[in-house]
Amino acid sequence: MAGGNGIIQAKKLDDGFLLTDYNGECFHLKSVKELKKALKKHLVNRTYIIQQEIESFTNTGEKIDFRIYIQKDYTMKWKLSGIETKIAKSGSVVSNSKYRARIEPGELAISKYYNLSKEETEKKINEITNVCIQVLKRMEKQGYLLGDAAVDFILDKSANLYLLEVQIDYAAEIKAFREEDEQRVLPYILTTPFEYAKALAGF
C-alpha cells in the first residue's frame, strides 16, 4: 500500500510471536490464537499478500530498500537517471519518509552494504537497470504510455534483486521541500522528461 500503510511484520520467537505494524508499534503474542486475533484486528476488509521477509539491512541492522529512476531522454529511449537508497529508522518495517532515517546515493550504498567492488557495483546496477527497462517495456505493450518511472526494489543479503513496485506518478517535485539528502537526485531526474517532451514535439 502507498507509503507503507498496511504493512505488518510477524516474527516467530521462542516464546511466541512479535507483530510490528507500519507505525512501529510492537505486540508480543504468546500463542497462534493471540496472533490470529491481532491479525484480524489489523487486517480490515482488504485482500493482503503474505510473503516471507527478504532480509535487506545495513551493517547496523536498519532496513533498506532502493529506488531507481528510469526515464526517456532526447533519444526517446529508456535510460538510468538516478538511484537512491532509503534507510529506515531503527526498528521500522518501512522506509517511507515518515519512518526514514536518511537517504544515501545508490551506488555508494550498494558497494558499502554488499561489499562489492566498483566494477561489481557497476555490473549490478546495469543488471537492475536492464530488468527495470524490460518491465517498463512490457507495461508499454499492455497499453501504458510511459516516459518517466521510478522502480522500488530491494537486494537480499546476497545482492539478488527483488522488484517491489513501479511508480509512474511519484511526484518528484515534493523532494524540493524535503531534506538535502533527498534532493540530491533532483538535478538528474527533473530535466530529462523535458528532453523527451521536446523530442516528441519534434524540436
Tell where the protein language model's regions lie, with residue ranges.
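Flexible domain-boundary/linker segments
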Residues: T85, R100, L145, A149, ...
